[in-house]
UniProtKB/Swiss-Prot annotation:
The keyword Kinase does not apply. It comes from Caenorhabditis elegans. Expressed from the comma stage to adulthood in the nervous system, including sensory neurons and interneurons posterior to the nerve ring, dorsal and ventral nerve cords, tail ganglia and, CEP, HSN, ASK, ADL, ASH and ASJ neurons. One of its GO terms (molecular function) is protein phosphatase 2B binding. This is Arrestin domain-containing protein 17. SUPFAM superfamilies: E set domains. Keywords: Behavior, Phosphoprotein. Residues 331-340 have a biased composition (Basic and acidic residues).
Length: 426
């Protein structure tokens, strides 16, 4: 039976979204109207990828699953120690007084994390969990997910800023193996690397040398690949294709050629490539679809760090527009929230058990440095990309997913979660 009126995790960043390598900080809020017996208030930060599905073959079933851990930090801030009741020189119990209690925490995320992802057969998920241990009773748990954005830099590959052309042909065959004429599709894009919010400029052409009229469409597609293993260790792969958007482009009569110039597709809030995950991958493509004949895919890459030279030009144009009093309304509405540095809690340094360094002495300094457990405010984006404007965030195009887990039941916290991804343009 839950015996706390409030047990909530609050992050100092209201977006609850962090780039890999940044510091995550916040506090646990405990509210109780009456004094409560407790042992400890514990904290756990976890990040991992997981895949799972059931493979059916006749009457038999094979459960496939795999996981890839990234970090698991557990520490005890020692908040309840000051409420210890001592009788006859012996510690008896800890009584949490009635009122509102705040337990601050901070942790610097590893730099090599992949982005948060929620899919049909797996996820990459990052969570913070607070545990109230009670004597001779069940623990009370509060759990909250947050977004991590992996550093996937479009600038790292110059080819991603170059145009691309993809061509496919299909020779139709009719009765008695007679040729019915070929259909050729060609698709051209202005560049191959993007971030959410950017527009893909597409030009395409269909050469229909068959006798049949063909309908055409332009599709923006996401393909997710999940890798898992059975209990016996056999690896299985599952591919899932999602159509993000589709634009019908009309018909191409037999014996004719039709061409379209600069059709635009705006990229919604989608996860960037998961380059640092071994069991999950996400790829994207723009496809020209010709009815019952062929599909011409043109791969693109979605990253989390945009092409900086173009972004700076766009930013200067936005500033000039603002100076002329013509700032678009959307720029005002979607501008990133201001970070209140004064609201951040004090940075702490902890050992493996969560004890403060000040309580352990100076001899721990070298060990903590070696283990990279120094809790320091991170400005990784400003260090790596000093000219890059701050992003703002939007929830995933696919909406929220159920994140409740049978093995990690929580009495407090949200059962659903939608990752957020960075935008740099309006």
């Amino acid at each position: 039976m839950v015996q706390l009126d409030r047990f909530e995790i609050l992050f100092n960043n209201p977006e609850q979204a962090y780039f890999a390598g940044q510091e995550i900080s916040g506090k646990v809020i405990i509210e109780n109207k009456e004094p409560k017996k407790v042992n400890e208030i514990l904290l756990e930060l976890k990040g991992r990828a997981r895949t799972y599905w059931t493979k059916h073959s006749g009457k038999s079933r094979k459960h496939c699953s795999h996981s890839e851990p990234y970090f698991l930090e557990q520490f005890n801030p020692g908040y309840t120690h000051k409420f210890t009741v001592v009788k006859d020189g012996k510690e008896k119990e800890r009584i949490l007084p009635a009122g509102i209690h705040q337990v601050p925490f901070s942790y610097t995320l590893p730099k090599s994390l992949p982005s948060s992802f929620e899919g049909e057969f797996g996820h990459i998920r990052y969570t913070c969990k607070a545990i109230c241990e009670r004597p001779w009773d069940f623990d009370i748990v509060s759990r909250k997910a947050f977004t991590v954005v992996g550093i996937e830099d479009i600038n790292s590959d110059p080819k991603l800023n170059e145009p691309a052309t993809c061509v496919e042909s299909n020779h139709a065959v009719t009765f008695c193996c007679r040729s019915a004429g070929s259909v050729t599709g060609e698709i051209r894009i202005s560049k191959c690397g993007y971030t959410p919010g950017e527009k893909i400029d597409v030009s395409f052409k269909v050469i229909n040398l068959s006798s049949k009229t063909r309908t055409t469409a332009l599709r923006f597609v996401q393909q997710t690949t999940y890798k898992a293993k059975t209990f016996a260790g056999h690896e299985h792969i599952k591919n899932v294709v999602r159509v993000i958007s589709k634009i019908d482009k009309g018909e191409v009569p037999g014996g004719s050629t039709t061409e379209w110039q600069e059709e635009s597709i705006t990229i919604p809030s989608l996860p960037p490539k998961l380059g640092k995950c071994k069991i999950l991958s996400v790829t994207y493509s723009v496809e020209l679809e010709v009815e019952q004949t062929l599909t011409v895919p043109c791969p693109i890459v979605i990253g989390s760090i945009p092409q900086l030279s173009q972004l700076l030009i766009h930013s200067k144009q936005s500033v000039q527009s603002a100076g002329n009093g013509s700032l678009p309304k959307s720029s005002i509405k979607d501008s990133p929230p201001k970070w209140d540095s004064e609201s951040c809690v004090q940075v702490t340094i902890t050992d493996e058990s969560g004890q403060l360094v000040e309580e352990l002495g100076n001899e721990m300094e070298a060990l903590l440095s070696a283990r990279k457990r120094v809790r320091m405010p991170s400005s990784i984006l400003s260090e790596l990309y000093p000219t890059m404007p701050s992003p703002y965030y939007k929830e995933s195009f696919f909406g929220a997913s159920d994140i409740s887990e049978e093995k990690e039941q929580a009495q407090f916290g949200e059962a659903s979660f939608a990752p957020k991804y960075p935008f740099y343009t309006d």
